[in-house]
Amino acid sequence: MKIADLITWFESWANPAWCESWDNCGWQIEPGILHEEARVLVCLTPTLAVMEEAIALQANLIFAHHPLIFSPPKSLRRGEAIADMARLAFTKNIGIYSAHTNFDQVEDGTADVLAQILGLKDVAPIVPTQGGLGYGRVGLLDPFLNLQELLTVIQTRLAPPDLIFSPTADLQQIISRVAVLGGSGAGFISAVAETGAEAYLTSDCKFHQFQESRDRGLILIDAGHYATERPACDRLVEKLRSLNLHWVQLSNQDEDFRQFFVK
């Protein structure tokens, strides 16, 4: 499949026009590769390590969730990450394409995959946007679990390096309704509280957001940005393989940019 055809297929599923105004979805760098057979390296975040991996694997497209460029840089200087990525993209003929908030909303996108991993039933968006799409997912556990069992499921299936949850939570509380949103989801706490969810799995939560959740009677669970979004990259690879692409692989150089000290 040509890269142009691949992008057309993807954008019929997750149109970049659906992204937020502050976001930058779609082509980050297109060095003239649209008519080449697609050799795709999928990653969460486009970094120099991923670019070097793409060069070594002779990939011609880095398909990332996070954008390389959020706002137009005022200058490009050698030694700066974006500048070096751009230089390598053009000299090695490797495109960089990002699907961010558009991919968050769709079926088999970041939130939908999290809901599937937890086995949620009767799933709906936390914040609907259009035609059954929307941010986050909320649904029922089947069977219901107590909080300790739910935390164990999350730890086992997502393998986060650290799992933070509301300190006043009762580990024996039965949880029936769970909300999920991959990546930075603390801004949706008010919307989640209105869904009747008893627990909310997301990431990047601050001190006072845990306080807000406690005051609303919502158990907030922070599994980290990487652990809550990387599974959707795995799913994207599966979907791309179903298209019989010439070559597609999940990056082995993706990074969780946080490290935890263990005594």
UniProtKB/Swiss-Prot annotation:
Which GO molecular function terms does the record list? metal ion binding
Recorded hits in Pfam families, A to Z, give: DUF34_NIF3
Does the record carry Acyltransferase as a key word?
no
Its keywords, alphabetically, are: Metal-binding
Q: Which residues bind a divalent metal cation 1?
A: H65, D104, E229
Q: One GO cellular component term, please give it.
A: cytoplasm
Note whether Metal-binding occurs among the keywords: yes
SUPFAM superfamilies, from UniProt?
A: NIF3 (NGG1p interacting factor 3)-like (SSF102705)
Q: Where does a divalent metal cation 2 bind?
A: H66, H225, E229
Q: How does it assemble?
A: Homohexamer.
Q: According to its UniProt record, which protein family does this protein belong to?
A: Belongs to the GTP cyclohydrolase I type 2/NIF3 family.
What's this protein's name? Answer: GTP cyclohydrolase 1 type 2 homolog
The species is Nostoc sp. (strain PCC 7120 / SAG 25.82 / UTEX 2576)
